[in-house]
C-alpha cells in the first residue's frame, strides 16, 4: 500500500508539473501575441471611400524580388507584438507592434510617395500609408501627429510622423505593416528589428505564403 501511495503521489506531481508547463507556455504566448486586439484591416474592411487597397482587382505575380537595400528602420523600438493570427480575436495581426513613446520620431522605411494620412477610430488611429519605389507599401499606425501630406515624396529615413497612442491601443506603440499589392507581408521577414537592419538586400515575395493575408 505504501508503494502504491508513493506511485500515486509521483503521478500527481507529474500531472501537476505538466499542467504548470502548459499553463506557463499559454501565458507567455498570450502575453506576447494577444495583449492587444488586432486592428480592423484598413485594406479589407471597406470603410474607406478612397480605396485603401487599390490592388483589389490586380493580378498578383506568384513571386517577386523586391530591393530592400536602401532602407531605414521606422523607429528604434523593440518589437512588442509580432505578425500572425490571434486566436482570441479570430483575426490576423497583419503587422508588428514596435515600442515607442508619444512624440518619438517615426521615419519612412524606404523612398516613396505618401498616399494617405488619415484617422481611423476603430483601430489604427492616425495613420500614414506610403507607396515605395520598390513596389512595397508601408503602413504606420497609432500616430499622434503627421509630419507629411498626401502626394509628398519622402526618402528612406525622412521623418513622417510622431509616435502616439491613438485608435484601438492600450499604450504607446507603432503598428507597422509592409504590403505588396495588398498582401500583408510579415515585416520580420524583411527587417531584423533586434539588430535594426534588413536580413538581406533583396526580399522575395511568395504569393502562396500570404494567401490569407490580403
Model-predicted regions and their roles:
Residues 149, 177-214:
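Acidic, glycine-rich catalytic/binding loops that coordinate metals and/or anionic ligands
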Residues 106, 112-114, 151-163:
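A structural signal for short beta-strand/turn segments enriched in small hydrophobics and glycine
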Residues 98, 126-130, 155-167:
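Short hydrophobic beta/alpha edge segments that flank linear recognition/processing sites
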Residues 1-82, 198-214:
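Polar/charged, compositionally biased leader and regulatory segments
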Residues 91-94, 108-147:
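Zn2+-dependent peptidoglycan hydrolase active-site motif and core
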Residues 122, 163-175:
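Active-site loop architecture of trypsin-fold serine endopeptidases
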Residues 81, 100, 116, 142-145, ...:
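A residue-level detector for short acidic-glycine micro-motifs
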Residues 56-63, 78-107:
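Short glycine/threonine/proline-enriched tight-turn/helix- or strand-capping micro-motif at secondary-structure
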